[in-house]
A protein has these predicted regions:
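Glycan-processing catalytic domains of CAZymes
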Residues: 1-207
Length: 207
């Protein structure tokens, strides 16, 4: 389970607290308030900050600012230099990550895509291979669809099992991530939640 070498189970979130969420009266960043919010996350058991969500500026400069805060409180960081709903990142973006973000002790890798279809797996796989070639100790984070996604319009695969098989075959990330909205407000759990979990677990154990 410890795919990132943390010495503990990796726990993160989706939407983030951006470095510019808190400002002083003159408009400058209030890093102490930002640090306090991330300290609360760490105290709750979260050990990886995921830089995604309602972010209006994913610049390298902003991410370096947040990395400095995370280094102070002992959290790790998965950035998003390219964003997760755009074209596959370029070689130039890998170079920027390697130069400016990867040297940080808090940096784990880069989030490049949320819920890709299978038609994107070849390109994503090539990007992951190049990322690992340049930074073998870092990783690319990709979040997949859940089992209830539409096969034709979302998965672009015949079925969910084939979708997972195709991803594992073509994209060599350290972790296989997917989202599943399974815990309902009334306390129930949707009927395929554990089926999805069991399928992904069995597939990844075979790798």
């Amino acid at each position: 389970y410890d795919v990132y070498g943390l010495g503990e189970f990796p726990i993160s979130y989706w939407y983030t607290v951006e470095p510019w969420s808190y400002t002083n009266a003159d408009g400058s960043y209030n890093d102490e308030l930002t640090k306090a919010r991330y300290q609360e996350m760490k105290d709750s058991g979260i050990n990886i900050a995921m830089y995604y969500g309602h972010a209006i500026n994913r610049s390298i400069t902003e991410q370096k600012r947040l990395l400095g805060i995370l280094e102070q409180i002992g959290m790790k960081f998965i950035g998003s230099a390219s964003g997760a709903h755009v074209e596959i990142p370029t070689a130039e973006q890998i170079a920027e990550i390697k130069e400016h973000l990867a040297p940080s002790s808090a940096y784990l890798g880069d989030l490049v895509r949320d819920e890709p279809g299978a038609h994107e797996f070849d390109g994503l796989g090539a990007y992951v291979d190049e990322f690992h070639r340049q930074m073998p100790d870092k990783d690319v984070y990709i979040n997949l669809f859940p089992a209830y996604a539409n096969a034709a319009t979302q998965l672009k695969s015949a079925n969910y099992e084939e979708h997972i098989d195709q991803y594992i075959e073509k994209v060599d990330t350290k972790a296989l991530s997917y989202d599943y909205y399974g815990l309902m407000a009334n306390g129930s759990v949707t009927n395929t939640y554990y089926t999805n979990l069991d399928l992904v677990r069995s597939k990844t154990l075979d790798v």
